[in-house]
C-alpha cells in the first residue's frame, strides 16, 4: 500500500541527551513527493496515529496541524460587508439610541407614530446619520485613546475601528448626511442650514486637535448643551411648538450629567492616554457627587415647573443612587466592565420608560406651575 511505502522512507535517528532519549525521524529524498500524495488531511492524521502507536517514530511534521478554511470570494465579500456595517452601527452608539430618541420625541408629546412620515424620517436621522457625525468624528480623533479603553468595540459603548475603517469613516459620515440635508431643506427650509452650521461648529469645538473642548474642563461638559439641537430639529420637522425654556434647561442638565457619567467610566483610559476631563481633574468621587447635584436640580425643575411626580421621583432616586455610589458602594473604585454594561442597560430601560411616559402624558411640553410660582 502507498501508506506503507511512506513508512519505508523513514529511518530513525536516536539522539541521547542526559537520561532522555529523543526519537526523531528523517525523510529521504522522496519525502516531498510522498507529502504531495498525502493531500487529504484525514490520511495525514491517520498516518500520525500509526506513527505514535509504534512508539519508535515521531511524526516529521513538527507542531499541531493547522486547520485550513477555504473562503469563496463571494462569501468573503459578504463577510466584509457585514463587518463594515457592524462597525458603522457601532459608531452611531446604539447604547445611546434610547436617550437620543427620548430627546427627539420629547417636544412631540402624544404624537401619532403610525401616520407621520416626518417623525420617522427625523427619528432615523438622529439615531444613525446624526450619531455617525457626533460620535464618528470623536472616534477618528480618539483612535489612540480608544485602544486603551476596554469599553470600546461594542454596540453598547461604541466602535474601535481599524486604520482602514477610520480612514474611510470621514467620507462615509459626509456621504450619509447629503440625502437628509436635501430632505430637510425641502421640509424645513433654509433655516436647516443654520442648524447644520451650529452642529458642525459644536462638533469642531469639541474635537479640534489642539484646542478641542473635550480635553478642557469645564468646556467638555458645557458643550453638551449642543444636544438641544435635537429639540429644535424635532419641533421644526414635525411642526410642533418649541419646548418651554425650563425644558431646555432640563435637557442641558440631563446631557451634562450623562456625559460626566461616561467620563467617570473612562477615567483610567483617559489618564493613560493623557486626556484631561472634568472627571480626571476632580476625581471619581467628586464627579459622582457632581452628577448627583445636577440630578437634584433636574428634580427641582420638573417638580416646580411641570409638576410631574413620576419623572421627578425617578430623577431623585438617581441623585440618591450616585450619593450612595460615591459614599458607600463603589466610592473611588472603578466599575468593572460587567457593571458598566449593567448600568447602561438600566439607563436604556429608564430612557424607554421615559419615552412611553412622555407619549402618554407629555408633561414636559407645557408648564404647569404651582400657584406661588405663577404669581
Kindly label every feature range from the protein language model.
Residues 143-192, 196, 276-309:
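Multi-pass membrane catalytic core of lipid/isoprenoid biosynthesis enzymes
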Residues 106-124, 181-193, 231-249, 301-310, ...:
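Helix-coil boundary and interhelical linker segments in multi-pass alpha-helical membrane proteins
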Residues 310-375:
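Extended hydrophobic alpha-helices typical of membrane-associated regions
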